[in-house]
């Protein structure tokens, strides 16, 4: 793998935004559309490589903290590399998208106008 997991998460989000500028989406739904409608990685061997590169214990800790805070309990099977990695990507994607002030402050509860996708992309590329 040439890109780090975090770089690939960023690239996934930015590519999605570029490819879907004409889509009517609420800002608050964008994270779900990008990171929860398809799997980031499907093969267990690839999932293991990503987790080793990121740090398995760091991934477990991040997922546990996120799920306990947001759901009150841990529901992801932390022994399954596929489930662990895809939940980690979901969390990293949320953290990354939160770097866009336009997305989180202006269009969170509104449809994102087509011309604002470029602004969001520019903000995210600076991260």
Q: Whereabouts are the PLM-identified features?
A:
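Short, extreme N-terminal segment that most often corresponds to the first beta-strand
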Residues: 1-26
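Acidic, low-complexity, intrinsically disordered interaction modules
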Residues: 22-121
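Short acidic DE-rich linear segments
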Residues: 124-127
């Amino acid at each position: 793998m040439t890109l780090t997991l975090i770089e690939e998460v960023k690239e996934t989000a930015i590519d999605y935004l570029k490819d879907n500028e004409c889509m009517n989406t609420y800002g608050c739904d964008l994270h779900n559309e990008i990171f929860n409608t398809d799997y980031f990685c499907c093969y267990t061997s690839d999932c293991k490589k990503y987790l080793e590169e990121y740090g398995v214990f760091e991934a477990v800790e991040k997922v546990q903290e996120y799920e306990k805070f947001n759901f009150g309990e841990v529901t992801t099977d932390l022994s399954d590399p596929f489930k662990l990695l895809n939940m980690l990507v979901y969390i990293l994607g949320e953290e990354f998208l939160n770097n866009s002030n336009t997305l989180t402050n202006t269009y969170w509860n509104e449809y994102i106008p087509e011309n604002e996708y470029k602004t969001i992309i520019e903000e995210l590329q600076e991260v």
